[in-house]
Amino acid sequence: MNGMSGSSPAAPAPSPSSFFQHRHRHGGMMHMTFFWGKTTEVLFDGWPGTSLKMYWVCLAVIFVISAFSECLSRCGFMKSGPASLGGGLLQTAVYTVRAALSYLVMLAVMSFNGGVFVAAMAGFGLGFMIFGSRAFRATSSNSHTEVQSHC
């Protein structure tokens, strides 16, 4: 009598193994420990695939995203200034973009691919070295005050 009331019977809940069967059809089981290799999926289904060239593109993208996220964290976009609606909206937009980029890097690292992890950490490290550390800060010969922003 379920058909008469206009509702269909509830679909059975997928079994825990159905996820892994789906993953197996699409190139193997999902890794739950770190592994090394070019055949992986990062952020999107089928990307970067099995191509070594696309794997290197993936690593470069993760590196750039993590370095840019660090740039947004360290540059003067987030510094306080005179109170204004426009300034507050700009700070909010920059903060939101930085948070989104950081979460994308986190999700990429959750692929458990060792190369992706190394690319993310190298991007964050280089971003900090350029935008946050003392390595590239210029000092004035007269007052010995540091330049705070590298942007």
Swiss-Prot record:
The chain crosses the membrane at residues 52-72, 103-123. One of its GO terms (molecular function) is copper ion transmembrane transporter activity. It is a multi-pass membrane protein. The keyword Mitochondrion does not apply. Highly expressed in stems and at lower levels in leaves and flowers. Its main location: membrane. Keywords: Copper, Copper transport, Ion transport, Membrane, Transmembrane, Transmembrane helix, Transport. It is found in: Membrane. It holds the Pfam family Ctr. GO terms for cellular component: membrane. It comes from the Eukaryota. Induction: No change in expression levels after treatment with high concentrations of copper. Belongs to the copper transporter (Ctr) (TC 1.A.56) family. SLC31A subfamily. PANTHER family: COPPER TRANSPORTER 3, SOLUTE CARRIER FAMILY 31 COPPER TRANSPORTERS. Involved in the transport of copper. This is Copper transporter 3. It comes from Arabidopsis thaliana (Mouse-ear cress).
